[in-house]
Amino acid sequence: MKRRTAECFSSETFHVSRFTSHESLVGRRGALSYEFERAGPRTILTCSSCTSPWHHFPPSYLDDSGCAYTWLVNPSGGLVGGDHVSVEAQLHAGTHVLMTSPSANRVYRSLSEPAVQEVHLSVGPAARLEWLPEVTIPFAGSRVRQSIHVDLAPGATAVVWDAIASGRVAMRERWAFAAVENEICIRTPLGGSVVERYCLVPGRLSESVGLVRSWDYVASLFVIGDAVDADVWKRLDVVLAAILEQRPGLVLGAVSTPAAPGLVVKFVARSAPDLTETLEAIWAAVREDLWNLPVPNLRRY
């Protein structure tokens, strides 16, 4: 896994390798690593490690599907400038893992260095990954750089969610962060990729925010995998589009078909409840159509 990480996060990905020696001494260096295997009907954790600020929790089993529900916990409450944290997970053949977080990912004000978070997830043959962290909240003056890279083996399916708030909305702090850079890259077995990149610098480049400025939440959901029939994708496309139309004026979005097998949902929302309710409806539809599984109530645990 160490070798894969070095290859995945090369100098062209947000130019991480260009950090100076001074910057390397600032902030925390935290790493969280998981390895999952199939044991009978269940997915089990076979290997793990973590360093501060990450805290390790073993997976839970909330239903009889065998899915390993795994929480990513940062007890420090967020990231500060100079922090460089990473998450790695290897899902072996036939496993099913859901990775989420118990609270929002807060990014605090920084004078110069960004907070960096790198995620690399490898999904084995016929494995299922659900990446559903809570929203990222960049505080005023914060700088954050995130990359999420997912590698899919034949028959693997990934559901990848990413959402960002305009700031501390309850404090009337909107689009006041210094910079947010984000990259999501999902690689398919045949060598294709689904990639989303953006850089938001509200103070210098108002056009980098554009029409999104009047909304408080921006979200993306990727559902990618070659194990799903084309008819299922078509049906799910219609269902997801209908969900986005249920909150006119509160949610605005669309469903698109990428070059890889799957769907991409992009939407903006007025409030946190609008964001959460839309995600839960979309997630429920995806689980039902792809795997005939209900959505667990993660908030109870």
Residue ranges and their predicted role:
Residues 8, 12, 19-136, 140, ...:
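N-terminal, charged/glycine-rich beta-strand/loop interface patches
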Residues 54-58, 108-113, 141-143, 169-173, ...:
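A short, polar/proline- and glycine-enriched secondary-structure boundary/capping micro-motif
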Residues 139-147, 152-178:
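Acidic (Asp/Glu-rich), glycine- and aromatic
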Residues 162-301:
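A structural signal for small-residue-enriched, beta-sheet-centric alpha/beta enzyme cores
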